[in-house]
Amino acid sequence: MPSCQPGKMPAPWPWWLQLLLCIPSCVAVLPGRAGELKVSTQTGSVRGLSLPVLDGHVSAFLGIPFAEPPLGRMRFLRPEPVKPWQHVLDATSYKPACYQMVDTSYPGFQGTEMWNPNRGMSEDCLYLNIWVPSPRPKDAPVLVWIYGGGFYSGAASLDVYDGRFLTYTQNVILVSLSYRVGAFGFLGLPGSPEAPGNMGLLDQRLALQWIQNNIHPFGGNPRAVTVFGESAGAASVGMHLLSTQSRTLFQRAILQSGGPNAPWATVTPAESRGRAALLGKQLGCHFNNDSELVSCLRSKNPQELIDEEWSVLPYKSIFRFPFVPVIDGDFFPDTPEAMLSSGNFKETQVLLGVVKDEGSYFLIYGLPGFSKDNESLISRADFLEGVRMSVPHANDIATDAVVLQYTDWQDQDNREKNREALDDIVGDHNVICPVVQFANDYAKRNSKVYAYLFDHRASNLLWPPWMGVPHGYEIEFVFGLPLNDSLNYTPQEKELSRRMMRYWANFARTGNPTDPADKSGAWPTYTASQPQYVQLNTQPLATQPSLRAQICAFWNHFLPKLLNATDNIEEAERQWKLEFHLWSAYMMHWKSQFDHYNKQDRCSEL
């Protein structure tokens, strides 16, 4: 769990990043482009701006509303479609991010602050942004980005999500959308109309509906929409593949480092209700029913909810988040695991993958012995405590199984190996093996699946070398940031970014990421019999036979069976101890009686 204090805003961005944002007052609209910057939609007209990129321009339409502001009584409710407007809407600047916790763990450190809101925060936050090639295309493929952030943070306006490079180089339309996070988006009382849960997912769905109805005037093809996201954004993409009411709103899907079946991605209705009630108690609410609880929570200012939301977690852990999607019987008719195994999902082409060190980023947020400011060499005692926090739902037997699986028993006190093992445990458990299981379930239904492992560490990465290729650090290559000369990427990294943008765009166009210009050959499909994947780095495309097959068999098959078999072991042990105590007491009583009998004077035999 992050150790940061919410409410503090990040330090100002360096001047070169501020220039990158190209605020409207700095951008001249060239003659002949003015017509491209006004678009009429079903909800009203919008006027965007022209942004310079490389040796050309793209048109950007920033801050278009797709829902009514979820203010006042609309807090915790399903979103309502935006009402039409009559004026020409100024769409030349980003809108504020949705209210969320701000990471102040390392003040002034851009490695963390690059993920913090950079446009302020508001509950009035349901807007989307569109980047369009210039000149405006006709029926271009559309890529829709859903940001990650553990369902408690994230913003569509982050610099790393700047859509101009991907739009310009690949002649695609890029859309980024906002959705409510934390308690505002995922506090759930399933069955109650006051706070049904999954509001953030419904925000996303409403944005996808707006795109279906309105992307054509921007030059996009509503029948060629690919939804993509990273981490909780990837989990969201997977959830729309599962939810029957979302499936018709897009054609293809890309999941980067996340899936709907991840252990952190959903909670049960009982757990969701328990967390909502605990938040109310933490905020001093007195309530006898759902309406009274929600009424009290609506009376609190946003920062009060943010300050207390992490207190609802039931155990000390990392890679667990306070308010997440709930299995409500509506958006989700069943658990993601059950829906995937039964084939109850949208059958389509899927591109998915992970980065090399998925766990390292999370280790510094609470595991003993870890810090970005040292080598984080981990003692055996800290390793064992780290395992317990990394698998918080596991009983002692399952925890021991994880320790057994990841320990080098010939060198168990090696602090570097203990650090690397915890990196692997957190990454395998929370990201890699859920993604592998998702890919396997899709491949079994003969859907086209393409898989990757991104294992290039950026030359300008701010995180220490021991963290390797951390969670989230393929995104800059997908969005083309290395093409910005001021960010000091190497020529090889610029080429890697160009390749990755081509892969993603080719997939959006055709359902196959293969780049015809790539001499390395075709990107193989991932099948049930041949679960192949490619490595994405500065070297030529290389195919590998399977992704952590042995270790994912442990997480996806063995450990669930072990947990199921030992689910009642603590109760059985308690009953055994109670019965043993009763038996022991009985035996002590019998022995006492027997000793007393032996001491009695007895008549001699006649």
Curated annotation (Swiss-Prot):
Any single GO BP term: acetylcholine catabolic process in synaptic cleft
Keyword S-adenosyl-L-methionine: no
InterPro entries named among the record's database cross-references: AB_hydrolase_fold, AChE-related_enzymes, AChE_tetra, Acylcholinesterase_fish/snake, CarbesteraseB, Carboxylesterase_B_AS, Carboxylesterase_B_CS, Cholinesterase
Primary role: In muscle, it terminates signal transduction at the neuromuscular junction by rapid hydrolysis of the acetylcholine released into the synaptic cleft. In liver, its function is unclear: it could serve as a safeguard against any diffusion of acetylcholine from synapses into the circulation. In venom, its toxic role is unclear: it could result in less musculatory control by rapidly hydrolyzing acetylcholine, or that it works synergistically with alkaline phosphatase (ALP) in paralyzing prey through hypotension.
Residue pairs linked by disulfide bridges in the UniProt entry: 98-125, 285-296, 433-552
Entry's family note: Belongs to the type-B carboxylesterase/lipase family.
UniProt-annotated catalytic positions: 231, 358, 471
Summary of subunit composition and partner proteins: Isoform S is monomeric. Isoform T can form oligomers, including collagen-tailed forms.
GO molecular function, one term: toxin activity
Modification after translation, per record: The N-terminus is blocked.
Name of the protein in its database record: Acetylcholinesterase
EC number, UniProt record: 3.1.1.7
Positions glycosylated per UniProt: 289, 374, 484
GO annotation, cellular component aspect: extracellular space; plasma membrane; synapse; synaptic cleft
Membrane topology of the entry: Peripheral membrane protein
Keyword Secreted included in the entry's annotation: yes
Main location as per UniProt: other
Localization of this protein: Synapse; Secreted; Cell membrane
Effect of substituting residue 101 to Y: Increases peripheral site inhibitor binding
Reaction catalysis annotation: acetylcholine + H2O = choline + acetate + H(+)
Native species: Bungarus fasciatus
